[in-house]
């Protein structure tokens, strides 16, 4: 999938380098420097074994209110999760080193890590490369940044849009990584978005929390939630547009729409790059008791190994979908349930459809991308989740991950 053309974002400088967290030669370190006065907001994993960098970011954003964040450091190859005090100390030392170089407080430095869980971060690999990486900071290195944070990803993921705030054009750009262990709750894998708009931290936090629910929280690859899920949004205020203090400000209408679009673009790229994936599937549930109920049913379908292996085998096995609907433990009206593949009814009013055509169903699911919709017949709640299939290649990738 081609990486989009992303122009410089005023107030953002980017550089990458090789810290040596991988046995083979590749760039695995990302450094971003932000202009003074940059606002930041984030959402993070609610995993019970959150990583040291997640703890650090949450603590610093709470302490500063997201005001004047100056830097972001990201490493790939070591998650620094389940590493106790040594892992936390490693993050602090990196933040201190970056703070000294950028003449800012350590609390103004955000950090994220991805890779193998249980290995303590060797922070000396990062601090030793800081002078070299800092010397290469430039405004147009978004593609390099996307590649540096990859783990099992097969392509770098980026998105870009422009919006208008009170007559001023502003830019929004982002990168993300993730291919497996994707079933986010409050965030997803790693994603970093920057804008040159001027938005107060509290408003920025409201926006990122709101649109995470409709984007990153609606995708799944394998049902496993990561220990390191992090989404950070930075606003440099360098566009010349007036500063916005409320998320509901009418002047933000276009920006809100474009921000949600960038986040959804990144989230869907994660699914399309799901480990071993050959299918991209949109699952919509209608007629549920509430949107939350619909979302739970849709996620249960999307994460069912039996459903996902049927997708891989290009088998329109609608019985497995009905099984997953019932397993969600949400209110449904059995005698009203319908299942469609695209426009083709597999089941209707609780029975196999009179229009059911096995040949047409089989032909439809041979497409690389297709849609499944379910109506559970109890209310007006609806939700959409995007997923992929589960293939032998997924097993091979994860079986060989450390070896």
UniProtKB/Swiss-Prot annotation:
Predominant subcellular localization, coarse grouping: cytoplasm
Pathway(s) the chain acts in: Amino-acid biosynthesis; L-arginine biosynthesis; L-ornithine and N-acetyl-L-glutamate from L-glutamate and N(2)-acetyl-L-ornithine (cyclic): step 1/1; Amino-acid biosynthesis; L-arginine biosynthesis; N(2)-acetyl-L-ornithine from L-glutamate: step 1/4
Reactions this protein catalyses: N(2)-acetyl-L-ornithine + L-glutamate = N-acetyl-L-glutamate + L-ornithine; L-glutamate + acetyl-CoA = N-acetyl-L-glutamate + CoA + H(+)
A single GO molecular function term of this UniProt record: L-glutamate N-acetyltransferase activity
Site, Involved in the stabilization of negative charge on the oxyanion by the formation of the oxyanion hole: residue positions: 114-115
Residues bound to substrate: 151, 177, 188, 275, 398, 403
Site location (Cleavage): 187-188
Alphabetical list of Pfam families matching this protein: ArgJ
Keywords associated with the record: Acyltransferase, Amino-acid biosynthesis, Arginine biosynthesis, Autocatalytic cleavage, Cytoplasm, Multifunctional enzyme, Transferase
Subunit structure: Heterotetramer of two alpha and two beta chains.
NCBIfam families listed in its UniProt record: ArgJ, PRK05388.1
Family assignment from sequence similarity: Belongs to the ArgJ family.
Name listed for the protein in its UniProt record: Arginine biosynthesis bifunctional protein ArgJ
Origin species: Caulobacter vibrioides (strain ATCC 19089 / CIP 103742 / CB 15) (Caulobacter crescentus)
Gene symbol of the encoding locus: argJ
């Amino acid at each position: 999938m081609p990486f989009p053309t992303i122009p410089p974002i005023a107030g953002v400088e980017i550089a990458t380098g090789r810290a040596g967290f991988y046995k083979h030669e590749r760039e695995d370190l990302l450094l971003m420097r932000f202009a003074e006065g940059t606002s930041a907001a984030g959402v993070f994993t609610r995993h019970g074994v959150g990583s040291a960098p997640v703890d650090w970011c949450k603590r610093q954003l709470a302490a500063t209110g997201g005001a004047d964040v100056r830097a972001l450091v990201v490493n790939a190859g070591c998650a620094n999760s389940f590493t106790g005090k040594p892992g936390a100390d490693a993050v602090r030392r990196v933040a201190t080193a970056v703070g000294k170089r950028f003449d800012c407080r350590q609390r103004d430095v955000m950090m994220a890590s991805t890779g193998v869980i249980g290995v303590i971060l060797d922070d000396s690999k990062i601090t030793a490369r800081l002078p070299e990486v800092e010397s290469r900071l430039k405004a147009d290195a978004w593609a390099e940044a996307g590649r540096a944070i990859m783990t099992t990803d097969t392509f770098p993921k980026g998105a870009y849009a422009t919006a208008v705030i009170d007559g001023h054009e502003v830019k929004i750009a982002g990168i993300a990584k993730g291919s497996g262990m994707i079933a986010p709750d409050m965030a997803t894998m790693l994603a970093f978005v920057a804008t040159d708009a001027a938005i107060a931290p509290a408003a920025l936090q409201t926006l990122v929390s709101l649109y995470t629910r409709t984007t990153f929280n609606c995708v799944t690859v394998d049902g496993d939630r990561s220990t390191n899920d992090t989404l950070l949004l930075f606003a440099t205020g360098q566009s010349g547009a007036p500063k916005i203090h409320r998320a509901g400000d009418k002047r933000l209408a276009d920006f809100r729409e474009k921000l949600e679009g960038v986040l959804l673009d990144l989230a869907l790229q994660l699914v399309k790059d799901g480990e071993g994936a050959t299918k991209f599937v949109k699952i919509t549930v209608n007629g549920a008791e509430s949107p939350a109920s619909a979302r739970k049913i849709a996620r249960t379908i999307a994460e069912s190994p039996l459903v996902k292996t049927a997708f891989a085998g290009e088998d329109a096995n609608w019985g497995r979908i009905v099984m997953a609907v019932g397993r969600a433990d949400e209110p449904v009206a059995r005698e009203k349930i319908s299942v469609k593949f695209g426009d083709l009814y597999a089941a209707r009013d609780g029975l196999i459809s009179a229009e059911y055509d096995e040949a047409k169903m089989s032909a439809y699911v041979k497409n690389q991308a297709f849609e499944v919709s379910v109506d559970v017949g109890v209310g007006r709640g609806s939700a959409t989740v995007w997923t992929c299939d589960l293939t032998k290649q997924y097993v091979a990738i994860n079986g060989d991950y450390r070896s």
